[in-house]
Amino acid sequence: MPSQAVTYTTAAVAAVATGFLAYAVYFDYKRRNDPEFRRQLRRSARRQARQEKEYAELSQQAQRQRIRQMVDEAKEEGFPTTSDEKEAYFLEQVQAGEILGQDPTKAIDASLAFYKALKVYPTPGDLISIYDKTVAKPILDILAEMIAYDPSLKIGTNYTGGVDVAELMREMASAPGVGLD
């Protein structure tokens, strides 16, 4: 009796494989010889690509809206003012960002934690260069959107005196060249 079950199973598998092969041959024949079928395939591919593009744009807009909402909520909560509170808050937020950054589904939450740490850090420009070396790119991209949305965040280093190198570089870039080729 077991050999009969094996025979039925083999026959069923062979029938399914033959059916699949026959459909593949038929599809290839229609694709090569029927111009209307080819047009229909192209239309279908274009329609699908357009739907995917629209979905990507909508999801990107939704993500931007969520990022803005999270930044606004963080600003409403406020940030510490004393140096001891800032230091503790900074360490807490960086640690939270590192933990959340290990899970790719929590990239926005990790970025928010790094953003909060950036808000209390005395020289945000230096911290961004550290983030650039240690934080994953998707998180950095979201963090960049958060920074771009918040005009109160000054990225340049807090410089207390002497020559402001960033301002000097901007002035030099706007001045005509001397021709030092």
UniProtKB/Swiss-Prot annotation:
<keyword id="KW-0496">Mitochondrion</keyword>
<dbReference type="GO" id="GO:0030150">
    <property type="term" value="P:protein import into mitochondrial matrix"/>
</dbReference>
<dbReference type="InterPro" id="IPR023392">
    <property type="entry name" value="Tom20_dom_sf"/>
</dbReference>
<feature type="topological domain" description="Mitochondrial intermembrane">
    <location>
        <begin position="1"/>
        <end position="5"/>
    </location>
</feature>
<keyword id="KW-0812">Transmembrane</keyword>
<comment type="function">
    <text>Central component of the receptor complex responsible for the recognition and translocation of cytosolically synthesized mitochondrial preproteins. Together with tom22 functions as the transit peptide receptor at the surface of the mitochondrion outer membrane and facilitates the movement of preproteins into the translocation pore.</text>
</comment>
<keyword id="KW-1000">Mitochondrion outer membrane</keyword>
<keyword id="KW-0653">Protein transport</keyword>
<dbReference type="InterPro" id="IPR002056">
    <property type="entry name" value="MAS20"/>
</dbReference>
<feature type="topological domain" description="Cytoplasmic">
    <location>
        <begin position="28"/>
        <end position="181"/>
    </location>
</feature>
<protein>
    <recommendedName>
        <fullName>Mitochondrial import receptor subunit tom20</fullName>
    </recommendedName>
</protein>
<dbReference type="GO" id="GO:0016031">
    <property type="term" value="P:tRNA import into mitochondrion"/>
</dbReference>
<feature type="transmembrane region" description="Helical">
    <location>
        <begin position="6"/>
        <end position="27"/>
    </location>
</feature>
<comment type="similarity">
    <text>Belongs to the Tom20 family.</text>
</comment>
<dbReference type="Pfam" id="PF02064">
    <property type="entry name" value="MAS20"/>
</dbReference>
<dbReference type="GO" id="GO:0005742">
    <property type="term" value="C:mitochondrial outer membrane translocase complex"/>
</dbReference>
<dbReference type="GO" id="GO:0030943">
    <property type="term" value="F:mitochondrion targeting sequence binding"/>
</dbReference>
<keyword id="KW-0472">Membrane</keyword>
<dbReference type="GO" id="GO:0006886">
    <property type="term" value="P:intracellular protein transport"/>
</dbReference>
<keyword id="KW-0813">Transport</keyword>
<keyword id="KW-1133">Transmembrane helix</keyword>
<comment type="subunit">
    <text>Forms part of the preprotein translocase complex of the outer mitochondrial membrane (TOM complex) which consists of at least 8 different proteins (tom5, tom6, tom7, tom20, tom22, tom37, tom40 and tom70).</text>
</comment>
